[in-house]
Curated annotation (Swiss-Prot):
Binding site for Zn(2+): 302, 304, 307, 333
Pfam families: TGT
Encoding gene (name): tgt
UniProt keywords, alphabetically: Glycosyltransferase, Metal-binding, Queuosine biosynthesis, Transferase, tRNA processing, Zinc
Cofactor binding description: Binds 1 zinc ion per subunit.
Function: Catalyzes the base-exchange of a guanine (G) residue with the queuine precursor 7-aminomethyl-7-deazaguanine (PreQ1) at position 34 (anticodon wobble position) in tRNAs with GU(N) anticodons (tRNA-Asp, -Asn, -His and -Tyr). Catalysis occurs through a double-displacement mechanism. The nucleophile active site attacks the C1' of nucleotide 34 to detach the guanine base from the RNA, forming a covalent enzyme-RNA intermediate. The proton acceptor active site deprotonates the incoming PreQ1, allowing a nucleophilic attack on the C1' of the ribose to form the product.
Residues at the active site: 89, 264
Taxonomic source organism: Shewanella halifaxensis (strain HAW-EB4)
Lineage: Bacteria, Pseudomonadati, Pseudomonadota, Gammaproteobacteria, Alteromonadales
Protein name: Queuine tRNA-ribosyltransferase
Amino acid sequence: MKFELDTTQGRARRGRLIFERGTVETPAFMPVGTYGTVKGMTPEEVRATGADILLGNTFHLWLRPGEEIMRKHGDLHDFMNWQRPILTDSGGFQVFSLGDIRKITEEGVHFRSPINGEKIFLDPEKSMQIQDSLGSDVVMIFDECTPYPATEDEARKSMQMSLRWAQRSRDEFDRLENPNSLFGIIQGGVYEDLRDESLNGLVDIGFDGYAVGGLAVGEPKEDMHRILEHVCPKIPADKPRYLMGVGKPEDLVEGVRRGVDMFDCVMPTRNARNGHLFTSEGVIKIRNARHRDDTSPLDDKCDCYTCKNYSRAYLYHLDRCNEILGARLNTIHNLRYYQRLMEGLRGAIETGTLDAFVTEFYTSQGREVPEVPELTD
């Protein structure tokens, strides 16, 4: 992988990630394909929304279908017929989400399978081996996602263990002679000094990119912004910066303003299946009866397949009848909305008009533009 940085405005960055399987323009949003599929979508449909890269889930793909079946197909690209870049998370967040059915030790994590209750052990070495079998273009280190709330001492112990796991991930990745890219994950909770210690330790080990983890786990939005403002300018400028698991459209806008290059989140797809649709004027709840006889498209500014061909009334009808097509059309629209947002942000950085773009983004939804500190490096 090669990262090219074209231009900046304030801390916002316009660039690209170049892989053998294709180029990803940044800032970029990655749709989530947990089980090797973006729910309800074919790879061709996902690509048509403008997505250049997908996120796959190491933990779930390890449990089903497993490494053996994956290797029989070649890798995840061949298994799901997506021949563009794929980033896989390490499984750390999913283990974190298991709560009481897992036990974390220095060696790794013991837990029971959420599928059949089988006892399973996952450690940094195994995570690297699974991601190697997936053929991931970007491999994430195995870490512990520091929960919120956590005391500073709890966050320190968690972060320092993640650093030790980062070294083990690096060592196993190198032992496997994996030709792809490995990203480190910055932890430390809401504590700036711990974030600094984490980043410095990761830079000493050496990675191809750096993710900010342990955010969007329940902390106030102000804390997320504060941590991003603190840590992003300290990440080596020639490496991509990835904010994991974020988020709402406004989170992408605010992340880009603070120097983030990559995002992922289940929100556009999950919300689509629940009838919450993103538009240039805000969120539409298609289940609301006021859409029953509305012949207008979801968003007259949107160029997606759904908006070009179907009315709000039709989408309301599909939802009321619980038709699968409704969830699919909603997903196409929400994914395209996210990609159009990223296209707009990239264009605004290129032309030096990011402030105007951000103002239009908020005012078109009847919202005030949030105040931010002067963000310059």
